[in-house]
C-alpha cells in the first residue's frame, strides 16, 4: 500500500457532488486533504438568494463528514479583472466568449493554485472530468476521461504544462452515475444535488438581464444578407452565430423555413439573418485562432498536422488540418468538411485521438478567402 499521508492535496470544493467525491476519494487514498471553497462572484441570484452561502454550508457538511479541514477564499477581485472584464470586452466586439475556459486558466488553476501552494500543497484537485498521464520524459499529457458525456477537457484546453503537473483528477476513470453512487453510499449531502449550469461562477440567471447591467444595449435593424429590413434586434451582444431562438421572425411568402443569425455588422449595428438551417453563410471552410496554448509546451517552430477539433462544447470531433505559426502563436485550421456556425470568441480545442493537445481563441471564420459573420 502506497503511503500518501505526507502528500497534501488542496481540493477546490464548490458544494457540488463532483468536488465532494473528489475530496472523499483522495481522503480514502490516504492523502493529506484540505478543502477550500472559492467565492468568485457576489452571486445573489434573480430571486435574491445568495447561492454561495448555501454552497459553502454544503462544503462544511461534506468536509466534516469525511474528516478534513476546510477554508474559504475570496477571488472576486481576481475574477473581475482576469475573467469578467475580458468577457465584457469580447461582447463589445460582437463576439461570443467562453468565460469558463478563461476562468479555469486564470482562477481555478492560477489564483487557486497559488493559494494552495501557500497552504503547502503538493497538488490541487477539483471535480473536473479529465485525465492526465506522464510519459517517460516527465511530460504530462491531458487525456479524455472515461465519461465522454462529462468530458471537460474542452474547458481545460488553455492550461499550461506547469499547471497540469500540479493537478490530480480523481474522477478520471469514473462516470457521473458512479460518482453519485459513491456520494450516496458515503452519506454525502451533495449526492443528489443538481449540476450547476450557466456561466462559470455566475450561475443560472436571466442572461439578457444580467448582461444589460454591465453593457448598455443598443437596438438596431435585423436585415437579410441583401440588406432587406425584416425586424429589430435588442442589441448585437444578445445574439450568437447560428442562433434560431428569440428572433421573433415568422415565415415569409417565399419560405416557411426558420430564421438564423448569420452575421453582425458592427459599424451599422445590424444583425444579419437568413432563412434556412443550411444557409451557406453559416458554413466555413477554415478558421483562424490566436493565443494558442499547448499542454506539452509552446512549439518554437511552424508545423502542419492533421488531427480533430471542437469549436464548441459537446460537439463531435471534426477532422482538420492545422497550420501553426510560431512567430505570432496563431493557427489556420482547415476543415475536412464545411463546418457550421463557427463563432468568433469561442474556444478552438485540438485532439489527437484520446489526447487533448491544447487550444486557442477563434478570431475569424472563412469561406475560402471570404471572412464570414463579423463585418
Curated annotation (Swiss-Prot):
One of its GO terms (biological process) is tRNA wobble position uridine thiolation. Its EC number is 2.8.1.13. Its main location: cytoplasm. GO terms for molecular function: ATP binding; tRNA binding; tRNA-uridine 2-sulfurtransferase activity. Disulfide bonds join 103-200. Residues 98-100 are annotated as: Interaction with target base in tRNA. The record marks 128, 346 as: Interaction with tRNA. ATP binds at residues 12-19, 38, 127. It is an enzyme of class 2 (transferase). Keywords: ATP-binding, Cytoplasm, Disulfide bond, Nucleotide-binding, RNA-binding, Transferase, tRNA processing, tRNA-binding. The keyword Transferase applies. Gene3D superfamilies: Adenine nucleotide alpha hydrolases-like domains, HUPs, Translation factors. Residues 150-152, 312-313 are annotated as: Interaction with tRNA. The keyword ATP-binding applies. It is found in: Cytoplasm. GO terms for cellular component: cytoplasm. The active site is at residues 103, 200. It catalyses: S-sulfanyl-L-cysteinyl-[protein] + uridine(34) in tRNA + AH2 + ATP = 2-thiouridine(34) in tRNA + L-cysteinyl-[protein] + A + AMP + diphosphate + H(+). Belongs to the MnmA/TRMU family. Catalyzes the 2-thiolation of uridine at the wobble position (U34) of tRNA, leading to the formation of s(2)U34. NCBIfam families: PRK00143.1, trmU. This is tRNA-specific 2-thiouridylase MnmA. It comes from Lactobacillus acidophilus (strain ATCC 700396 / NCK56 / N2 / NCFM).
Amino acid at each position: 500500500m502506497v503511503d500518501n499521508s505526507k502528500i497534501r492535496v488542496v481540493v477546490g470544493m464548490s458544494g457540488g457532488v463532483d468536488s465532494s467525491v473528489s475530496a472523499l476519494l483522495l481522503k480514502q487514498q490516504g492523502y493529506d486533504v484540505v478543502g477550500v471553497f472559492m467565492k468568485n462572484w457576489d452571486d445573489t441570484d434573480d430571486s435574491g438568494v445568495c447561492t454561495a452561502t448555501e454552497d459553502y454550508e454544503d462544503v462544511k457538511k461534506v468536509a466534516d463528514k469525511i474528516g478534513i479541514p476546510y477554508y474559504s477564499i475570496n477571488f472576486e477581485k481576481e475574477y473581475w479583472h482576469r475573467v469578467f472584464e475580458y468577457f465584457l470586452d469580447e461582447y463589445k466586439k460582437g463576439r461570443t466568449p467562453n468565460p469558463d475556459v478563461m476562468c479555469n486558466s486564470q482562477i481555478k488553476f492560477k489564483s487557486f493554485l497559488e493559494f494552495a501552494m501557500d497552504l503547502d500543497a503538493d497538488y490541487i484537485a477539483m471535480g473536473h472530468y479529465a485525465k492526465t498521464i506522464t510519459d517517460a520524459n516527465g511530460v504530462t499529457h491531458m487525456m479524455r476521461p472515461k465519461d465522454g458525456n462529462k468530458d471537460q477537457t474542452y474547458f481545460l484546453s488553455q492550461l499550461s504544462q506547469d499547471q497540469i503537473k500540479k493537478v490530480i483528477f480523481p474522477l478520471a476513470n469514473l462516470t457521473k452515475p458512479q460518482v453519485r453512487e459513491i456520494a450516496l453510499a458515503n452519506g454525502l449531502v451533495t449526492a443528489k444535488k443538481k449540476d450547476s449550469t450557466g456561466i462559470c461562477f455566475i450561475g443560472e440567471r436571466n442572461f439578457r438581464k444580467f448582461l444589460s447591467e454591465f453593457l448598455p444595449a443598443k437596438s438596431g435593424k435585423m436585415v437579410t444578407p441583401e440588406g432587406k429590413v425584416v425586424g429589430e434586434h435588442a442589441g448585437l451582444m444578445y445574439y450568437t452565430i447560428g442562433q434560431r431562438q428569440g428572433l421573433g421572425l415568422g415565415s415569409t411568402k417565399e419560405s416557411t423555413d426558420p430564421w438564423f443569425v448569420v452575421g453582425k455588422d458592427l459599424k451599422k449595428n445590424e444583425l444579419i439573418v437568413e432563412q434556412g438551417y443550411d444557409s451557406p453563410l453559416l458554413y466555413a471552410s477554415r478558421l483562424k485562432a490566436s493565443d494558442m496554448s499547448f499542454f506539452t509546451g509552446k512549439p518554437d517552430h511552424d508545423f502542419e498536422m492533421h488531427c480533430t477539433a471542437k469549436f464548441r462544447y459537446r460537439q463531435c470531433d471534426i477532422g482538420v488540418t492545422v497550420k501553426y505559426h510560431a512567430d505570432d502563436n496563431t493557427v489556420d485550421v482547415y476543415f475536412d468538411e464545411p463546418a457550421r456556425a463557427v463563432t468568433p470568441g469561442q474556444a478552438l480545442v485540438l485532439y489527437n485521438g484520446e489526447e487533448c493537445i491544447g487550444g486557442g481563441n477563434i478570431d475569424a471564420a472563412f469561406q475560402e478567402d471570404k471572412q464570414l459573420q463579423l463585418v
